[in-house]
Amino acid sequence: MGQDYYSVLGITRNSEDAQIKQAYRRLALKHHPLKSNEPSSAEIFRQIAEAYDVLSDPMKRGIYDKFGEEGLKGGIPLEFGSQTPWTTGYVFHGKPEKVFHEFFGGNNPFSEFFDAEGSEVDLNFGGLQGRGVKKQDPQVERDLYLSLEDLFFGCTKKIKISRRVLNEDGYSSTIKDKILTIDVKPGWRQGTRITFEKEGDQGPNIIPADIIFIVKEKLHPRFRRENDNLFFVNPIPLGKALTCCTVEVRTLDDRLLNIPINDIIHPKYFKKVPGEGMPLPEDPTKKGDLFIFFDIQFPTRLTPQKKQMLRQALLT
């Protein structure tokens, strides 16, 4: 039986984002290996990080809630059927300190997250550090989830961040919101990085961290993307698979393609449609290809007469 991420964080399945963050904050500070002397702290700290990594991500949480840990880590089909391409399974990166750092915005939990008396210090995008040589805070990475339509046409995303801004005295700071604008270009691929230099927390003795957004693709109801190509799964009755057909595909730009199939469609068959994939980032006027796969639907019952007709047609 898969592990229960909600139990790991001590929350219920209907918990909201704020409750998930609060639970992770409390448990991570309690079980951090540099804070706790318990032998089990390292493993608990890792489990807490993995649970938060999943539940704080709407897409991962949605898959986990519906399909459990097995579906999350093993992958799920975009459309159910025997020949359906599957999503890539989730793998925890195994670095709980990375989750801790990204959550609090610093690297050393005891120099930046606790004062001399052990009280917590609130941080966001990199923390205020003590006096000394100016040093830039470690870069902060955030996922930027985009739909295939966003990546096909391009779009503009405005993201609000909260960060510490130095006051006029040059020492104290105030948390203020700022809007960052990202101009998404047609054809951007998953993993594209957008860097906002020195937009992290300000402090008297630090250089603000760079904030980096990393493009992640949302699941799409019709297509799966592979590099610059699109995969489409078309359900088809066995009769049409054997006797030719025309496939209709509604594209991302809302055109209806009518693709004639004159071959016998077998389980490993696919149809390539050149130039109907995603725009190429280097030249958006050019596109990748569309690959059509088929989910052959077999009948569940046949009358004796139909069986005899099939024998005569296929076995003689």
From Swiss-Prot:
Cellular compartments annotated: Cell projection, Cilium, Flagellum
Q: What is this protein called?
A: DnaJ homolog subfamily B member 13
Q: Which UniProt keywords apply?
A: Cell projection, Chaperone, Ciliopathy, Cilium, Cilium biogenesis/degradation, Disease variant, Flagellum, Primary ciliary dyskinesia
SMART domains according to UniProt: DnaJ (SM00271)
Its cellular-component GO annotations read: cytosol; motile cilium; radial spoke; sperm flagellum; sperm head-tail coupling apparatus
Organism, as annotated? Homo sapiens (Human)
- Residue ranges of the TM segments: none
Q: In which tissues is it expressed?
A: Specifically expressed in testis and trachea.
Query: Keyword Lyase, does the record have it?
Result: no
GO BP annotations, alphabetical order:
axonemal central apparatus assembly; chaperone cofactor-dependent protein refolding
Superkingdom, taxonomy of origin:
Eukaryota
> What clinical condition is it connected to?
Ciliary dyskinesia, primary, 34: A form of primary ciliary dyskinesia, a disorder characterized by abnormalities of motile cilia. Respiratory infections leading to chronic inflammation and bronchiectasis are recurrent, due to defects in the respiratory cilia. CILD34 inheritance is autosomal recessive.
